[in-house]
Structure formats: C-alpha cells, structure tokens
Amino acid sequence: MSVAALERLREMLRQQGGLIATLVDRASVAHADLDREVAPEAVAHSLGENGLDSPASLAAEGPLTEARSEEYELLVEAIYEGYLLHYGSPRVVRAPDADLRLLAGDRLYAIGLARLVELGDTPSVAELADTITLSALAQSAGERQLADAIWLAGARAVGWGSSEAHRHAKRLVSAGAPEAIEAMRTSALPAGA
C-alpha cells in the first residue's frame, strides 16, 4: 500500500464532507499502529496476497495509467477501501457497525468509479465493476484467496489492459469453476512471467 495514496484518500474524503467525512479515521496512516484494531492476517489481506503492493499501486504502475498514476492510485484505493469495508479491515474509514460499514463501502465504490468516469476510461470502469462483483462472489463462497487474486488481476488489467486469459479467468469465477483461482492468479502475472 502507498501511505501517500491513503493520506490523499483520507484528505479527499474529509473534503467531500457529509457522513463519509465523519468516518475518516483521525490517525495518520503513516503513524497508525495497525495492530491496535486489526489482526495480522487482516493487515496482510489488505496488502494483497504474498505481501504484494496494493491493487492501487499495481494499477498505477501500468503503461495505460502512468500519465495519471497518482489519480489512478487514489481512485483504486477508494474502491479497494470500499471493498475492505465490506470484507476486510479498512485502513482509512472506521464505521462503528456493520450497516454503516456496508453503506460507507458502497459510497467509496461510487466515489472511485465516478472519478474513473471523469477520466473517460470506460474499459477500466467495466474492469473494476467486474472486480467488485467477482470478488463479492468469491467472498460469499468463502474463497478469500480467490478474491485477492481477482483484485490483483483486475488491477493489472486496469494498468496494462485486459487479455483473453483474464477474460477467461473471469468467466471461470462466474461459473464457480474450481480452476478459477489458478486462472485468475495467472492472469495477474506480468506478461511473459
């Protein structure tokens, strides 16, 4: 995760005002003691499988996003924070109950996707909408590792473009196929890896 991106997300949400601004954790991400409320496995989950960069950092590193890397990192962090409010341990927003976590998560999805629409990047809007949907399917099936793989593959598709392997992996996830996790992990790898 990029601490700078999370700090930008924190500031953006405060500036938006409204209910979401009241839920922003007051502690700086750079100085937060992550162990205070979050189990170690939840911290690892929020960073992506095997300690990889966050999906936002990965998406922002690609050739399709490099001209606006900070904006892409911020909007993907917003969407990923929404996902973590639903299924993990958020890093920026603290909601006191499950209903508020769900609403705040949905709001962050909307904020991130709206910023992406403003950039005119409709393929990435579709990709991240698929990522949200497919990771929710994986979570509902108790497949957290599959959800992680979906996020990493979705981030790679935003930064580098989709591929037939990635589209095939998404179809496998939708079908509930047992080989979906390996296909998704493979589609998340750099070309030629």
Predicted regions span which residues?
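All-alpha prenyltransferase/terpene-synthase fold signal
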Residues: 1-193
